[in-house]
């Protein structure tokens, strides 16, 4: 969303071959960029003008910080001499962005190349995240200079010595190993090494919501996702407590509910933590902490350790029982309601459909029910857990992968936060499908309110015609009240040459006992 202070910057980006896309709000622009990032792996570039433009982007930048998304945030600002006497829209933007970024720099014309290279490096190394560059008008207008910066990439490290020997011994001796796989695996070339490691040693695994699909969820060792569902945790956490070896592989507990605090006990269980950054969260502890390359570490652990025969671990077959219990807890055969909506989408849409999910009760249910076949198939805000992200994420994903079916899942409140971007989808000529759970309520908060026996306050609102909104912005719109109507709407949407809003009318309280 440009302003006068970033016009030169926008022009320079286009001339450098970086396509600039106009959104209706800076927050949504950042989430569109994240949707593209999950396709090509490149950092998001978010451009905002000074003052209100920069501040409109605070939410998505905080999300990038907590959800580990590489992002370079370029904000316009007036020059220091000008700011000494000119105050209109002027504030200390670096002070605003510093707490929610990995770094914030004021761009200087004499060091612009160095600072820009630093920004990309910091955003993409270690645990990914946002970096802010405040760009004064005179610096943006200054001619660029070529400077060859010879920067060697960070080396891949692996454990060695006594630590490695101890970890191998635990792996060889474990009768009930369990792996917890988290979002750090997405930023390393981990899929093949992880699969080989888990299969070689017959280790059942749970993923966080963001790591779903790092191995196909129909894999016999996969127990599905974990994060925010007390219902799922009733089955998963006893298995965690019963394990004799916990392997935390790229696991970042920022995605998890408090029930996962100290979910294992290093005093009676062997716990090995392989991670991108040191453990400063104290959500859990381990006997051995390895800040190292995940693929290199898994290879080092396996070297000299004998493979396990199938079913050589967990002689009591408890993981299989847990997997069956989870399938029963989140059934696919409900006639209607939130679970029925998700089940019908699973039955009708292609197996490789790309999904985005807004925060709310529906996201928890979707993350537990949907079986992902590839990494990043289901994208969501699971660290900051912000609303209003699914619709723009889907626009970005469709922009990057126009030949794939792309579907967003939003509650009605979250959809309303981003509904203006329907215009962007129309202007870009994109045809994602926007599924809306319409119950006229902040369903998750209303459920918590009732559980605390508090009066119904500020959680319910009027029902709106979301299908008409889709049509008003040049797309298609369908209002559906059962699985047959939903199936027909999805089928039509997949054949359409423009976007489609599918408004699924469900009853309030439909998530009770479901999440």
Regions found by a protein language model. Name each.
Residues 1, 6-12, 220, 317-392, ...:
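Active-site diphosphate/adenylate-binding microenvironment
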Residues 1-306, 348-351, 431-434, 454-455, ...:
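N-terminal alpha/beta PP-like core and its mobile active-site loop of ThDP/TPP-dependent enzymes
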Residues 2, 75, 137, 209, ...:
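Short, small-residue-rich loop/turn micro-motifs
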Residues 82-89, 228, 242, 281-282, ...:
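Thiamine diphosphate
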Residues 107, 146-148, 165, 169, ...:
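Phosphate/pyrophosphate-binding active-site segments
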Residues 133, 249, 274-275, 357, ...:
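Active-site flanking residues adjacent to catalytic metal/cofactor-binding acidic residues
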Residues 178-182, 354-358, 412:
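Short hydrophobic beta-strand segments
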Residues 179, 246, 355, 406, ...:
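Receiver (REC) domain switch-region micro-motif
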């Amino acid at each position: 969303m440009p302003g006068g202070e970033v016009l030169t910057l926008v022009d320079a980006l286009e001339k450098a071959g970086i396509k600039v896309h106009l959104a209706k709000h800076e927050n949504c622009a950042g989430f569109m960029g994240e949707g593209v990032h999950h396709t090509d792996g490149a950092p998001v570039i978010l451009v905002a003008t000074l003052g209100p433009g920069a501040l409109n982007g605070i939410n998505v930048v905080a999300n990038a910080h907590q959800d580990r998304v590489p992002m370079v945030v370029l904000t316009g600002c007036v020059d220091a001499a000008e700011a000494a006497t000119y105050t209109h829209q002027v504030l200390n933007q670096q002070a605003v962005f510093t707490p929610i970024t990995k770094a914030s720099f004021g761009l200087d014309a004499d060091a612009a190349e160095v600072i820009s290279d630093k920004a990309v490096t910091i955003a993409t190394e270690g645990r990914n995240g946002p970096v802010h560059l405040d760009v004064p008008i005179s610096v943006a207008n200054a001619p660029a200079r070529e400077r060859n910066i010879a920067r060697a990439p960070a080396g891949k490290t692996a454990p060695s010595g006594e630590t490695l020997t101890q970890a191998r011994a635990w792996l060889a001796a474990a009768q009930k190993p369990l792996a917890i796989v988290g979002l750090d695996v997405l930023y390393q070339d981990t899929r093949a090494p992880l699969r080989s490691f888990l299969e070689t040693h017959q280790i059942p695994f749970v993923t966080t919501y963001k790591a779903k699909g790092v191995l196909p969820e129909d894999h016999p060792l996969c127990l599905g996702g974990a994060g925010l569902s007390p219902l799922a945790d009733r089955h998963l956490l006893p298995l965690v407590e019963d394990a004799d070896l916990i392997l935390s592989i790229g696991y970042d507990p920022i995605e998890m509910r408090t029930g996962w605090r100290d979910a294992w006990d290093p005093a009676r269980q062997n716990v090995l933590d392989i991670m991108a950054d040191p453990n400063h969260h104290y959500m859990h502890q381990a006997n051995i902490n390895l800040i190292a390359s995940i693929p290199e570490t898994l290879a080092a652990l396996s070297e000299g350790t004998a493979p396990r025969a199938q079913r050589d671990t967990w002689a009591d077959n408890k993981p299989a029982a847990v997997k069956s219990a989870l399938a029963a807890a989140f059934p696919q055969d409900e006639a209607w309601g939130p679970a029925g909506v998700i089940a019908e989408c699973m039955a009708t849409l292609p197996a490789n459909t790309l999904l985005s999910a807004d925060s709310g009760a529906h996201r928890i249910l979707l993350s537990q029910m949907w079986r992902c076949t590839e990494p990043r198939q289901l994208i969501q805000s699971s660290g900051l857990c912000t609303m209003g992200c699914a619709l723009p994420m889907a626009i970005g994903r469709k922009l990057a992968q126009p030949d794939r079916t792309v579907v967003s899942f939003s509650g009605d409140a979250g959809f309303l936060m981003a509904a203006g971007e329907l215009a962007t989808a129309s202007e870009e000529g994109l045809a994602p499908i926007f599924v809306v759970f319409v119950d006229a309520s902040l369903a998750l908060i209303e459920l918590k309110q009732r559980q605390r026996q508090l009066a119904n306050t500020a959680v319910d609102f009027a029902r709106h015609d979301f299908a008409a909104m889709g049509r008003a912005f040049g797309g298609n719109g369908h209002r559906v009240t059962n699985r047959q109507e939903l199936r027909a709407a999805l089928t039509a949407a997949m054949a359409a040459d423009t976007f489609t809003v599918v408004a699924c009318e469900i009853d309030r309280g439909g998530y009770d006992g479901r999440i």
